[in-house]
């Protein structure tokens, strides 16, 4: 599902379980790879949310996105922080599970 500055907060606050928020842009080769790899991977999340960084400058600023793709974990409306891993399923699973153990915070 695609989110933007106007829809992200409501969607993330209402979504039960784990959500992976993924910032990408059309001109980013690694982002195109992420759009292929992530939906096909078996990840410990209930859903993937995509944000076009070029169209959602407010979210980019609030989440402190500097490099794309940028991945963040949200659980039951709480922010668990960035997920930093290569775009390979085992590494992503491990990074998501590590992020899931963090102390939850309010969404940025």
PLM-predicted stretches and their roles:
Residues 1-18, 101-108:
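N-terminal leader/targeting and pre-domain segments
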Residues 2-3, 23, 44-58:
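Thiol-based oxidoreductase modules, predominantly thioredoxin-like and allied folds used
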Residues 7-11, 55-59, 91:
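Short acidic active-site motifs
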Residues 7-41:
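Local sequence-structure signature of Cys/Sec-based thiol-disulfide redox active-site neighborhoods
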Residues 63-72:
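Structural micro-motif
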Residues 73-108:
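Non-catalytic, surface beta->alpha helical segment in thiol-disulfide oxidoreductase systems
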């Amino acid at each position: 599902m695609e989110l933007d500055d106007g829809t992200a907060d409501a969607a993330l606050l209402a979504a039960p379980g784990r959500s992976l928020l993924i910032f990408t842009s059309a001109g980013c080769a690694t982002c195109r790879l992420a759009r292929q790899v992530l939906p096909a991977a078996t990840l410990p999340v209930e859903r993937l949310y995509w944000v076009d960084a070029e169209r959602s400058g407010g979210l980019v600023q609030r989440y402190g996105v500097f490099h794309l793709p940028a991945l963040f974990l949200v659980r039951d409306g709480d922010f668990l922080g960035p997920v930093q891993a290569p775009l390979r399923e085992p590494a992503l699973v491990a990074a998501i599970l590590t992020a899931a153990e963090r102390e939850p915070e309010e969404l940025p």
